[in-house]
């Protein structure tokens, strides 16, 4: 199948399923099961419930899709996990 035949949708991850699969609520209102694309696995991009994602689907099977992109959070300060514990000191060579 040529890449021109694939359809892209945006949606919201509602549930994480076993085997790197996700239940995704599309913006159009449909709910599908999507799996993580190989490049996302290779680059260790983690997807959590509540993330906005882009899904690639075949026009022949509109119940399954491939998760190809996780959108960055629009929340302020969402640039990483918060650190816990005391602040670190400066690095000193011996």
Swiss-Prot record:
It comes from Rhodopseudomonas palustris (strain HaA2). The gene is infA. Keywords: Cytoplasm, Initiation factor, Protein biosynthesis, RNA-binding, rRNA-binding. The keyword Protein biosynthesis applies. The keyword Cytoplasm applies. Residues 1-72 form the S1-like domain. One of the essential components for the initiation of protein synthesis. Stabilizes the binding of IF-2 and IF-3 on the 30S subunit to which N-formylmethionyl-tRNA(fMet) subsequently binds. Helps modulate mRNA selection, yielding the 30S pre-initiation complex (PIC). Upon addition of the 50S ribosomal subunit IF-1, IF-2 and IF-3 are released leaving the mature 70S translation initiation complex. One of its GO terms (cellular component) is cytosol. One of its GO terms (molecular function) is translation initiation factor activity. Residues 71-94 are annotated as: Disordered. SUPFAM superfamilies: Nucleic acid-binding proteins. It comes from the Bacteria. It is found in: Cytoplasm. Belongs to the IF-1 family. Its main location: cytoplasm. Component of the 30S ribosomal translation pre-initiation complex which assembles on the 30S ribosome in the order IF-2 and IF-3, IF-1 and N-formylmethionyl-tRNA(fMet); mRNA recruitment can occur at any time during PIC assembly. The lineage of its organism: Bacteria, Pseudomonadati, Pseudomonadota, Alphaproteobacteria, Hyphomicrobiales. This is Translation initiation factor IF-1. Gene3D superfamilies: Nucleic acid-binding proteins. PROSITE patterns: S1_IF1_TYPE.
């Amino acid at each position: 199948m040529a890449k021109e035949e694939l359809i892209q949708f945006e949606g919201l991850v509602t549930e994480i399923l076993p085997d790197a699969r996700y239940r995704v609520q599309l913006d159009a209102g449909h709910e599908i099961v999507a799996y993580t694309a190989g490049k996302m696995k290779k680059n260790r991009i983690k997807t959590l419930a509540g993330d906005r994602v882009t899904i690639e689907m075949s026009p022949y099977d509109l119940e399954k899709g491939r998760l190809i992109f996780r959108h960055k959070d629009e929340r302020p300060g969402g640039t990483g996990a918060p650190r816990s514990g005391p602040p670190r000191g400066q690095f000193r060579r011996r």
